[in-house]
């Protein structure tokens, strides 16, 4: 009985303590609903080592358009005095996403530098999501200006399907646009799937300009000290799987701006725009023709690479819990 009384007293005391801290504005908890779209392109490359030139030359390039990919998500912001912790999660709606273009240079080994194969397929995002978590500290220089530094982690997952493609096929000495190239009309079939994961550890600096008590403008810049990607291409018609992965340092960057309107004490509305781009970085590539779960064989003399350029637009409503 005495133990229960002590626990009750402790709970009551702790509740009053939290409430007092909240009233002092030391603790803040905010929840946001986010709706947005991403628009851009992700590119994958294959490079082959050419002995007579003693260099890696581009053998293949696949350009996966990401046109107006809508997503829904939520965000939680927790702050204690000048420290903050944030978590964001969002999922894409399955949708058409532009064109997948596949280009090949099969004559590079013999010194023929023209593009020999070109195909275009309808691209679709079957599923995808992204997660972002960060911790930061805010420096308040005045009522007008604050600077916030965040250290975080971002994770992205995409699964694309390219289908119903048409193509022009030359050979190792014939370009795709030649009269001697062979034209293949739309196939009406699923052709290539791409499962891609990329994540990064990043550092973000955010300037907060408090124009009025009802309006903020917050430009920001983000750089990733470490980035990693891995992807599996399934060439369905040939039943070949390609696996490639790689990492890089200080190759991914982002800049953007957030605009916040606060018409009510507990409710605010946000608009954000950002542009993400990375310096192309290379990795290893492996293959098999036995199935995705079978061992992949590392391809000697061949390298892979990853690149992306992405616009992001989002709007959100934010509720201040306390």
Task: Enumerate the language-model features and the residues they cover.
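Residues on the lipid-exposed face of transmembrane beta-strands in outer-membrane beta-barrel proteins
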Residues: 72-78, 131-137, 151-155, 201-209, ...
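Cleavable N-terminal export/targeting peptides
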Residues: 1-28, 322
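Substrate-binding/catalytic groove segments of enzymes
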Residues: 264-270, 279-283
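Transmembrane beta-barrel strands of outer-membrane/channel proteins
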Residues: 29-39, 78, 87-93, 137, ...
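Extracellular/periplasm-exposed beta-strand and loop segments of Gram-negative cell-envelope proteins
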Residues: 40-69, 93-130, 156-200, 224-256, ...
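Generic N-terminal amphipathic/basic segments
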Residues: 21-47, 60
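Outer-envelope beta-barrel architecture signal
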Residues: 23-31, 70, 81-85, 143-149, ...
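Post-signal peptide N-terminal segment of secreted/secretory-pathway proteins
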Residues: 64, 73-86, 90-95, 99
């Amino acid at each position: 009985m005495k133990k229960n009384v002590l626990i009750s007293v402790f709970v009551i005391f702790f509740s009053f303590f939290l409430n007092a801290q909240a009233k002092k504005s030391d603790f803040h908890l905010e929840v946001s609903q986010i709706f947005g779209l991403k628009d851009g392109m992700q590119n994958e490359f294959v490079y082959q080592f050419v002995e007579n030139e003693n260099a890696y030359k581009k053998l293949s390039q696949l350009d996966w358009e990401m046109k107006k990919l809508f997503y829904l998500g939520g965000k939680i912001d927790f702050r204690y005095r000048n420290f903050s912790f944030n978590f964001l999660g969002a999922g894409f709606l399955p949708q058409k996403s532009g064109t997948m273009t596949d280009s090949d240079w099969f004559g590079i080994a013999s010194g023929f530098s023209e593009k020999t194969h070109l195909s275009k397929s309808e691209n679709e995002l079957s599923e995808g999501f992204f997660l972002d978590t960060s911790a930061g500290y805010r420096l308040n220089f005045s009522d007008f200006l604050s600077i916030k530094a965040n250290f975080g982690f971002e994770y992205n997952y995409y699964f694309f399907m390219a289908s119903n493609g048409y193509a022009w096929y030359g050979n190792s000495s014939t370009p795709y646009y030649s009269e001697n190239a062979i034209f293949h009309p739309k196939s009406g079939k699923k052709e290539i799937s791409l499962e891609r994961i990329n994540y990064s550890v990043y550092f973000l600096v955010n300037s907060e300009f408090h124009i009025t008590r009802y309006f903020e403008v917050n430009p920001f810049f983000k750089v990733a000290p470490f980035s990693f990607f891995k992807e599996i291409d399934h060439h369905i018609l040939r039943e070949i799987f390609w696996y490639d992965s790689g990492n890089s340092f200080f190759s991914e960057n982002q800049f953007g701006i957030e605009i916040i309107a606060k018409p009510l004490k507990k409710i605010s509305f946000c608009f954000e725009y950002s542009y993400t781009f990375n310096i192309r970085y290379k990795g290893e590539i492996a293959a098999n023709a036995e199935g995705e779960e079978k061992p992949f064989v590392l391809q000697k003399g061949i390298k892979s690479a990853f690149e992306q350029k992405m616009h992001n637009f989002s709007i959100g409503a934010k509720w201040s819990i306390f």
